[in-house]
Amino acid sequence: MSTLPISSVSFSSSTSPLVVDDKVSTKPDVIRHTMNFNASIWGDQFLTYDEPEDLVMKKQLVEELKEEVKKELITIKGSNEPMQHVKLIELIDAVQRLGIAYHFEEEIEEALQHIHVTYGEQWVDKENLQSISLWFRLLRQQGFNVSSGVFKDFMDEKGKFKESLCNDAQGILALYEAAFMRVEDETILDNALEFTKVHLDIIAKDPSCDSSLRTQIHQALKQPLRRRLARIEALHYMPIYQQETSHNEDLLKLAKLDFSVLQSMHKKELSHICKWWKDLDLQNKLPYVRDRVVEGYFWILSIYYEPQHARTRMFLMKTCMWLVVLDDTFDNYGTYEELEIFTQAVERWSISCLDMLPEYMKLIYQELVNLHVEMEESLGKGGKNISNSLCQGRWQKELGSQITLVETKMAKRGVHAQPLEEYMSVSMVTGTYGLMIARSYVGRGDIVTEDTFKWVSSYPPIIKASCVIVRLMDDIVSHKEEQERGHVASSIECYSKESGASEEEACEYISRKVEDAWKVINRESLRPTAVPFPLLMPAINLARMCEVLYSVNDGFTHAEGDMKSYMKSFFVHPMVV
């Protein structure tokens, strides 16, 4: 991004004086509690991008195969044969798991709507545990509120799932996946989850278990489908689907070609963003900041990976990286006095604040303004009504002020644990996850209105639940490291102090809170929804991202294991078609 002169920006006027300690910028021997982060593991390998020679041909093949799959979806949906509808949900499941559902959103919606209207609560293959579980999961995922009472036929007179079901491995696996669509007080699905976990573990350990099934069980126990990112599931599922004797060759070929085409697009975007980041020269100007631009782009792809969201993806990416800068500044470098001034400057958003800031903060402040201007100019060129598209702008500034102000106050209080409820109310502001979800709507002119931004700025339950999941999963894996570097107490320490629980007990309690938050997400995804269904996906995908990012440790700061492997699959290793 080119540097825009800050004097060219139209600022709001403010008559309130900025309270400044004249000695802030000149204090000698300022003590800074910095932490030395590891350098980027990627170096400069993504700065350049070479377009594959066969990219145009692949795009043409994708378009041809899309038409074939679309015809099949429409044809099967139009059949009057009930068992063809069983085949239809299996096809939809494969399309979704192969990562190509975004090509067929209308066809999938119409097909599942037709199935819901046609069968209601009486699925045609209701005695088949695998089939009814798949039917239930797909309809719930699409927002149709089918009752979990459909599983009562698989329970005994005591209300427990029949032990005879353990002989149906595929059915047990399908029921397990369906159970993750549960909402609050849905005892049947709670019991289903407990029952299937036990039996899947036994099945996977059986030497006679099919290797493909064992792989699927291990993946499911590690991360259920409801919480899997689409692109990662596509990587997992393609080899499994290919082994199925009844697989659709056109569908498989489309999935591989589409993954390859998107991979090229993403690598090109990553090259652009790496150049932008390198040109900022923050490694020299702000050496305390984590150099995690590749990890940041992976993070953003979890929210939007589709081609039509390229512009929004770039807005999100730059927002993400500047939030990393702010996070490291508040957690790892700035003094209390500096942070207080910066808080006031962000709140006023006025040019008069610039001279009051320390030199390193002037850079941050100016670049935040530049990003805002860049977004305005880009949206203006696109013919969008900026007053609607950025109606949350004032809210973002207010939220930014709250973030910095609360972080500052917490830093001044030190690392002492406060009540968990207080910690959660504060961390929902300081985490900035709600801001990222709001920014995910900027640049989307399709179904986004001024009411959309009013809705997201009200912090509705699905946004809160998504933010809770991110915050708590981060705490579970990183609280020890945070304490070692003198960070504020996490939810683990807060609950331990409040309840007298051990660290292990606290982690178990916080994990249950994560499960409760997922139930809220599932409930808020059922129709009728507060906003169009596609606008719920950024909140859902943000929560899904945590299942990858915080599966073992803080995968953003320490990209190791699965996290590193996934990024290599996305950006380094070409898809073999």
Curated annotation (Swiss-Prot):
Its main location: cytoplasm. It catalyses: (2E,6E)-farnesyl diphosphate = (E)-beta-farnesene + diphosphate. Strongly inhibited by manganese at concentration higher than 20 uM. The keyword Protein biosynthesis does not apply. SUPFAM superfamilies: Terpenoid cyclases/Protein prenyltransferases (SSF48239), Terpenoid synthases (SSF48576). The gene is CASC125. It holds the Pfam family Terpene_synth_C. Belongs to the terpene synthase family. Expressed in flowers. Its EC number is 4.2.3.47. This is (E)-beta-farnesene synthase. Mg(2+) 1 binds at residues 327, 331. Keywords: Cobalt, Cytoplasm, Lyase, Magnesium, Manganese, Metal-binding. CDD domains: Terpene_cyclase_plant_C1. Mg(2+) 3 binds at residues 474, 478, 482.
